[in-house]
Regions:
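Non-catalytic terminal/accessory segments
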Residues: 1-228
Length: 228
């Protein structure tokens, strides 16, 4: 369960341009990206400039972030898994959010130490308070019970809290995914405020808007066993 501290602000532009040039043969693309990075940010009529990072929320920032982490993280992880791991290693990354699962605790600890060094080379740092090694999986509950510990810890990823659970039908292990509580509460508060603002609007219009909100929420969070 990992978090990169201030990722978009920490991107090293020199490394980024090297990665872009390696990935894209057309030099005009590289020059265009270089100009975009150095154009600054206009906010409240004031333009500010920075020598590092890329604007979070910028039109091409997600693309540049993926290019950066492809070289700084993805390719390295593949090599590490092949050369260092004896057990299974599972990696899931979406932009700058990622989780890594290990079969053996010792390999997880070694990977975390190696990852800190790898990221430091490219100006990145794991957030000390948001990066954790937790016991999770099919045998986590039983192993912790034998050691006199409580339930397995949970982790948040891409809007969901992931929980070790068992199916009621057969008792088999499953990963339960529930909407992150704080995110759900924030969304409900947002809807409440908007309904208050629309209180004098025609009911059919309000109903249509509310239906679209509920539909959008359901399309993303509507996974099995998630009641929120």
């Amino acid at each position: 369960d990992a978090d990169i501290r201030g990722f978009f602000d920490a991107i090293d532009r020199e490394w980024l341009m090297k990665f872009v040039e390696h990935r894209v043969a057309d030099r005009r693309v590289g020059r265009l990206i270089h100009k975009w990075l150095n154009a600054g940010v206009l906010e409240d009529g004031v333009r500010t400039y920075s020598d590092t990072g890329t604007v979070q929320g910028g039109s091409i920032s997600p693309l540049l972030a993926n290019i950066y982490l492809h070289y700084a993280f993805d390719l390295w992880v593949q090599q590490w898994r092949t050369r260092q791991a004896r057990g299974d290693v599972i990696v899931v990354r979406y932009a700058d959010d990622f989780i890594v699962g290990f079969q053996h605790k010792a390999e997880a600890e070694r990977f975390l130490a190696d990852l800190r060094l790898r990221f430091a080379k490219f100006g990145l740092e794991l957030h000390p308070d948001k990066t954790r090694l937790i016991e999770f999986g099919r045998f986590a509950a039983e192993n912790r019970r034998k050691r006199g510990l409580g339930k397995p810890e949970t982790f948040n990823f891409l809007g969901f809290t992931h929980i070790c659970a068992t199916k009621r039908s057969n008792g088999y292990f499953t990963v339960l995914r529930q909407t992150i509580a704080k995110r759900l509460q924030a969304k409900l508060a947002e809807v409440k405020a908007e309904l208050k603002r629309r209180m004098h609007d025609p009911v059919p219009e309000v109903g249509k808007w509310l239906a679209s909100v509920v539909d959008g929420h359901g399309r993303y969070y509507g996974v099995p066993m998630n009641l929120h």
